[in-house]
Every structure is written in C-alpha cells, then in structure tokens.
C-alpha cells in the first residue's frame, strides 16, 4: 500500500478486482449522510514536499480543507518502507531531503485544528538497508535458498526491539496518543510466505518446538510440521504487538495502537503471519483498519461485517476506504455508500487511502454529508 519498492509484490497477493460503482451510489444520487466518529486519512510527507516554508503553507491549506470536510484523524507517515524516518531521530535515519523536523511541524499544525494524529510506521520493510539494519544484515529475512529479502525478521528479538525503539522515541519526543502500525507482517509471495530460514530463527524455532526445520523436506500445508512452522512465525508478529503494547504502557502515558491490516483475517493469518483477529480478541490493539480497497459494495459489506466481529468489544474497527489505489478507483458516491455501510455495521469510523487521491470532488461530498 505504500512505497512502490514492495507494493507490487504485496498487492499481487490480494487481487480484489475492480467492479462497477455500487448500487445506490450513482453520481448525482448520493446515499444518506454518514455520521461516523472517526473520519481519517493516511498521509505521506511527499504531499507537502521537502521545502519547509512551502510545506507549512500547504499543510495549513490542506488541513483547513480537511477540517471543513469533517476529517478529524490524520495518519501521517513517519517511517517508510525504505527505512527512512520523517522526525527528529537519534535512532533511525532521516530522509535526507527533509533537513527539518517534518513530523513535529505537522503535529503542531494538526493540534491547532483539534485533529488526532497517528504517527504511521511501515514496521518491518527496510528496503534501503540503512543505519542499524546495515550494521546487522543478519536481521534481514533469508529464504530457504539464502536469498535476502528487504525486510527484517519479526522472529528475531533484536529486530523487534529496534522497531519498538523507534516508536518509543516518537512517543517520548512528541505529544501523541497513538502509534499506527503498517506492514506489521511478513512479506508475501503467492506461492510461499517469506518467513526467515536463517540459523538464528531456526534455532529459536527448534528451542520452542523441538523441530529441526532444516531437516523438513515437505514444505506444504499437508505436512503437520509445516503448519507448526506457519503458526510459530505468525506468533512472532503477535509477540511484537504484545511487546509494543507493554513498552508503551511503560512510558507512563496512555498511548493507543492502531493497525492497517489486510482485509481478510483468515487469509492474512496464513499468508503473511498477520493474525489481526487475535489482536482484536486480546485487545492488543485499540483500532483495526482493514484495507478494504474495492468498489464492490457487497464485498465491502461482507469484509467490514467480519472485521467488526473480530474487533468485538475491545477494539474499534475503522475500515480503510480506497479512494485511488492499485485495487480500485472510487467515486464520491461510492465513498459515501461505503461510509454508510460502515456506520450501519457499527464500525467506529473510516479512514481514506490516501491524501494524494482525496481530490476536491471527494472533499466536497464529505462537506455536504457531515
């Protein structure tokens, strides 16, 4: 969903076909007004650019427009899939194009308008292999053929500590009440998930299960041992979320967790080790944002209903509505229909992907439907 370097691979795993605009959402015939508590948008620093004076001017213009459209939640990227960060960091590597504290400046402008800000982390991708990741190549996922993947391995405690350290740094430097997780999963590939087959991961797996994965030849779901391997790796991602929750609690502040997740909980658990249904049941996250990027109203409704059930009473669900994505190109009417469905299904709100696609016709539709 984010940087192009990994997007093609990830999006190939989940082909939600384009469909015609949903019934009842034709242009000129808009659905009933939505009334949702959370009206959010995913945002990238590139929308504003690296020149501070120009960026600040555009921030003010865009956020004023958003306020008029009833947008109250901003999910702003602070770590991209290359590993660069957009805040004043002593741990991570700032994007060299931004020689100033982009996030701090943006946060101040959002606060003036009473908007909630979620610093958004693309957690495990590290495509540029920067900083500490460059110093620790053993952190990268290694395939059975010893091919390196441009993402770090959630199974390794040092990796989890590094990524959590970045999040704690933001929480300690800035007055934020949320941390937003994206790419909190393994890389996906249609034939086989890219779990780590490095020596340390295999040692940890054997220590926990007694199984020497290096001796397993039949790597398919017909093999019970392979299923143990899938479950164990999925569990490492959940361990990360659990460790993050504990670390945030240790700051002495109330900092909540939101997470962008794949739209189907069952497939996500098996294909990418992202058991977000369990996170909802356990209350490990406070908000789930399943990315349901489709124009098919019935499919959208089905997936939102399933997601809300996963959230239960402990986690609010605010589905991601695709405005302009690789999966769909929405319309203002289609957007409003999906908002209406979300409200009917008792979702806690919606989040739009993304700011770069939220053109004036969409904002005008939001202004008239508050």
What name fits each language-model region?
Residues 8-19:
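Bacterial N-terminal signal peptides
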Residues 44-53, 88-100, 147-161, 225-237, ...:
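The substrate-binding groove and active-site-proximal loops of carbohydrate-active enzymes
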Residues 63, 80-122, 232-251:
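Aromatic-lined substrate-binding rim segments of carbohydrate-active enzymes
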Residues 65, 145-282:
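Polysaccharide-binding and catalytic clefts of secreted carbohydrate-active enzymes
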Residues 57-83, 173-177, 285-287, 347-349:
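Catalytic domains of carbohydrate-active enzymes, especially glycoside hydrolases
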Residues 33-56, 118-174:
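Active-site-adjacent "subsite" loops/lids of carbohydrate-active enzymes
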Residues 284-302, 307, 315-370:
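Substrate-binding cleft of secreted/luminal carbohydrate-active enzymes
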Residues 48-57, 79-84, 96-98, 126, ...:
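Acidic-and-aromatic substrate-binding clefts and catalytic sites of carbohydrate-active enzymes
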């Amino acid at each position: 969903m984010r940087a192009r370097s990994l997007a093609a691979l990830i999006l190939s795993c989940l082909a939600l076909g384009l469909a015609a605009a949903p019934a009842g959402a034709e242009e000129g015939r808009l659905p009933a007004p939505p009334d949702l508590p959370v009206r959010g948008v995913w945002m990238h620093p590139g929308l504003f650019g690296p020149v501070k004076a120009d960026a600040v001017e555009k921030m003010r213009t865009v956020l004023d427009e958003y306020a008029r459209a009833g947008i109250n939640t901003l999910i702003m990227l602070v770590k991209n899939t290359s590993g660069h960060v957009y805040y004043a960091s002593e741990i991570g590597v700032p994007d060299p194009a931004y020689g100033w504290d982009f996030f701090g400046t943006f946060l101040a402008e959002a606060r003036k308008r009473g908007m909630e800000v979620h610093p958004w982390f693309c957690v495990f991708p590290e495509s540029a292999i920067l900083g500490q990741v460059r110093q620790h190549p053993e952190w990268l996922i290694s395939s059975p053929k010893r091919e390196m993947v441009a993402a770090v391995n959630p199974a390794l405690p040092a990796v989890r500590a590094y990524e959590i350290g970045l999040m704690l740094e933001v929480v300690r430097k800035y007055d934020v009440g949320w941390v937003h997780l994206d790419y909190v999963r393994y890389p996906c590939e249609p034939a086989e998930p890219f779990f780590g087959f490095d020596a340390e991961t295999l040692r940890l797996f054997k220590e926990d299960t007694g199984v020497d994965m290096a001796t397993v030849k039949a790597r398919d779901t017909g093999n019970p041992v392979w299923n143990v391997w899938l479950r164990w790796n999925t569990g490492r991602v959940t361990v990360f979320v659990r460790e993050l929750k504990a670390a945030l609690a240790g700051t002495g502040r109330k900092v909540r967790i939101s997470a962008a997740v794949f739209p189907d909980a069952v497939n996500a658990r098996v294909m990418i080790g992202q058991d977000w249904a369990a996170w909802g049941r356990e209350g490990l996250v406070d908000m789930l944002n399943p990315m349901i990027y489709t124009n098919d109203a019935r499919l959208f409704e089905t997936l939102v209903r399933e997601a809300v059930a996963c959230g239960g009473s402990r986690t609010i669900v605010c589905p991601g509505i695709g405005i302009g994505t690789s999966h769909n190109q929405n319309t203002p009417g289609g957007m409003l229909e999906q908002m209406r469905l979300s409200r009917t299904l008792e979702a806690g709100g919606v989040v739009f992907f993304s700011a770069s696609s939220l053109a004036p016709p969409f904002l005008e539709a939001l202004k008239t439907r508050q």
